[in-house]
Amino acid sequence: MYPDFPSKFIKASVLIAFWAGINMGTHVAFSIGFGFDLGPGYHAYIQTHGSLQLIGWVGLFIMGVSIHFLSRLAHFKFVDENKITLIYRLMVSGLIFRFFFHSILPYFHDSIWYGILSLGVVISATLIAMGIYDYIIFLISIVGSMQPSLFKTNRDIRVFLIMNIIGWVVYAVGSLILTIYMMASHEVSLIHNWHIFLVDFFILFSVFPICFGVGLRALPLFLRLPPIKWNVKKFSLIYFIVIFSLINFKLINHYIYIDWLQELIYSLSILKDMIIIWFLEFNS
């Protein structure tokens, strides 16, 4: 039995985007607009706002859509509704914890309450990581149950699904490590460079690939469009190689500054953009 469309994920993503994301964004804009002292909490608010939008809005939306469409694409009928509900509760609980505890943490930096509030941020990252873990188990089941008919070059989206899994894993583990380090070092925000790296990694490895995968397989199927005739597998491998190279060169550049490496990163970024534009133009 295929699962019903998990609309609760979509509803939660919209509510978090408007209730929590816009709430924090308004707070930051108000402080800047009226010239209030931003203080050490500025980066914390920016990071929390970004995380709520990325995981709360985009992430929950991706989860809801992929659970519905991917299970049907792979003819995977053994979806445990209780497991889907558990993923939802863990993700939403973690996001609410992040919003509440990280919003007020900067105001209690030198207070006895810092330990409790920072622990709340760590718990939020733990809950989100647990939700992502259960979601990844679902994705692995989907990849493992794909029928040979889906392995044709114009239908094979396994590389995109594997990239999606890698993106979720790295973001979940990385965010948990950064929050633990934040609490241990008595800070109110995550290490900026590594936080930005995780965001970029998640977008390049999870957001874009799942959009490619669902767009290539689900839209023609459900909208009764002509099937894809070009080599999807080759396209996915090209995208993976470009993104893998871009991420690794950025890591090297973080530790070792080389002039030509900057130009290479810039060139790979342009190539990545060209690949995305080609996909949009070719499938419009």
Name the predicted role of every residue range.
Residues M1-S284:
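Hydrophobic alpha-helical transmembrane segments of multi-pass integral membrane proteins
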